[in-house]
A protein has these predicted regions:
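Extracellular/periplasmic Venus flytrap/periplasmic-binding protein
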Residues: 84, 129-132, 137-243, 282-291
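Bacterial N-terminal signal peptides
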Residues: 8-18
Length: 403
């Protein structure tokens, strides 16, 4: 009898331990691969805070009777390191999906890797249109606007201006060329008589852009399309301001109205630069955006930037998709994510099924100093709905080699 009781006790303990272990394994695990060192870290950390803010609410209720947890890896803005970290997240950490990435080249490399591993990957900052365009596949998604969308927005805006002779200048890497190609392609389609009279390309992070600006100004174009971002954006805006370029030549730069760039620049930021942006903490002036900004400000002491916005909606898409899937299963998760809709600070966002690209708006404005703020902001904002600036599903099919 004692042996039977002891055996029963041991079996009970084993069952409890097994149950605890199974429950532990069933936690939804997200691997965040982003840049947390060097100048781009400001974007990586902002995104991380947006993701954490969303998880704080999501995990109060839970998803599938469990919680979403995450682990981070720093890609150091380098392709080889990013790819190595992605492999570590998949093979060592056993994550259910990967999110993140700023560097477009890193995003493309990781996308190619996860395709073979059949692990979902959601890009939330990287903007190359190849991610959900010609290089897109079942396992990759994007909650960021991409270069096609930004380029079309810029093309639409510039096509309504009287400018004919253009100069293109920017960062000599994937993002720079992608945004330039998209802007010019769309502008040329809408206004065939425009001419490209010259181009200037510099290495990413080039500290002195004044020689380039001086040469461009001397060429006397009617307008300039800048294809730059990150640290180069700061240097470009400084050079534009110090040379007075924006007072002489109209300029369009995607993300020129980014608060993360304009606020630190202060008086060094130029006025009169046209820019498109995917998120502003001060626009739209709606209850949903105000609530998001207040929650973020209370938690982290500063307003959210565009990375926080994208990471925030990414978290909610993940939660709703797993809930719809009904299980922690990668294939079911992907099926559920396709066509998923979530409310966001800028309105409803849909994950389009045909290309796994989030449908969200862009905001076109002009840099200007206003009395309400002690830094330059975007003014005269026009909202461009996502559906109006995205490629059609038929175009995506053709880009991927479909008939």
């Amino acid at each position: 009898m004692k042996k039977f009781t002891l055996l029963t006790l041991l079996l009970t303990i084993l069952l409890v331990l097994y149950s605890v272990n199974v429950n532990a394994q069933q936690t939804i695990k997200v691997g965040i691969l982003d840049t947390y060192s060097g100048p781009p870290a400001v974007y990586g950390n902002d995104a991380l805070n947006g993701f954490k803010l969303a998880l704080n609410d999501i995990n109060k209720k839970g998803v599938l009777k469990t919680k979403i947890e995450f682990t981070t890896r720093d890609d150091k803005f380098k392709v080889d390191i990013g790819l190595s970290m992605a492999k570590e997240l998949v093979m060592m950490e056993k994550v259910d999906l990967i999110v993140g990435t700023i560097n477009s080249a890193v995003s493309l490399a990781v996308s190619d890797y996860v395709k073979g591993e059949k692990v979902p990957f959601i890009v939330w900052i990287s903007k190359t249109e190849k991610i959900t365009g010609e290089k897109g596949h079942r396992y990759v998604f994007s909650t960021a606007e991409n270069t096609y969308m930004a380029g079309k927005a810029g093309g639409v805006a510039l096509s309504k201006k009287p400018y004919i002779k253009y100069w293109i200048a920017g960062d000599d890497y994937e993002y720079g060329h992608a945004i330039a190609d998209a802007a010019w392609r769309n502008l040329k389609a809408l206004k065939p008589k425009v001419e490209l009279i010259g181009q200037s390309w510099w290495k990413v992070g080039e500290p002195d852009l004044i020689p380039y600006i001086t040469a461009i100004t001397s060429a006397k174009p009617d307008a300039v399309i800048f294809a730059t971002g990150g640290a180069s954006m700061t240097n470009a805006l400084k050079a534009i301001k110090s040379t007075g370029m924006s007072e002489k030549i109209p300029i369009w730069i995607h993300t020129a109205t980014d608060h993360a760039v304009l606020k630190p620049l202060g008086a060094e930021a130029p006025q009169g630069v046209m820019g498109t942006m995917d998120y502003h903490f001060y626009y739209p002036d709606t209850p949903a955006n105000k609530a998001f900004v207040k929650a973020f400000q209370d938690a982290y002491g500063n307003p959210p930037g565009f990375p926080a916005f994208h990471a925030y909606i990414t978290a909610h898409l993940i939660a709703k998709s797993f809930a719809k899937a009904g299980a922690i299963d990668k294939e079911k998760f992907i099926n559920a994510m396709e066509g998923m809709k979530v409310d966001s600070p800028v309105g409803e966002v849909e994950m389009r099924a045909c290309d796994h690209q989030a449908v969200l708006p862009l905001f076109l404005g002009v840099t200007k100093k206003v009395p309400k703020y002690d830094f330059i902001i975007s003014t005269d904002i026009v909202t461009l709905p996502g559906k109006d600036i995205m490629p059609t599903c038929e175009e995506i099919k053709k880009a991927r080699g479909g008939s």
